[in-house]
């Protein structure tokens, strides 16, 4: 369970980073 929790935290971190990059990229496109 602990390992799963750590993996989920890592996944969540990566997902947020990816989402931020996508938002930044689309912002640059529409600027």
Curated annotation (Swiss-Prot):
Spectrin repeats lie at residues 1-10, 11-19, 20-31. GO terms for biological process: actin cytoskeleton organization; actin filament capping; central nervous system development; central nervous system formation. Disulfide bonds: none annotated. It comes from the Eukaryota. Keywords: Actin capping, Actin-binding, Calmodulin-binding, Cell membrane, Cytoplasm, Cytoskeleton, Membrane, Phosphoprotein, Repeat. One of its GO terms (molecular function) is calmodulin binding. It is found in: Cytoplasm, Cytoskeleton; Cytoplasm, Myofibril, Sarcomere, M line; Cytoplasm, Cytosol; Cell membrane. One of its GO terms (cellular component) is cytosol. The modification Phosphotyrosine is found at residue 27. Interacts with ANK2. Interacts with CPNE4 (via VWFA domain). Like erythrocyte spectrin, the spectrin-like proteins are capable to form dimers which can further associate to tetramers. Associates with the gamma-tubulin complex in brain, but not in kidney, liver, sperm, or uterus. Interacts with CAMSAP1. Can form heterodimers with SPTAN1. Fodrin, which seems to be involved in secretion, interacts with calmodulin in a calcium-dependent manner and is thus candidate for the calcium-dependent movement of the cytoskeleton at the membrane. Plays a critical role in central nervous system development and function. Belongs to the spectrin family. This is Spectrin beta chain, non-erythrocytic 1. It comes from Capra hircus.
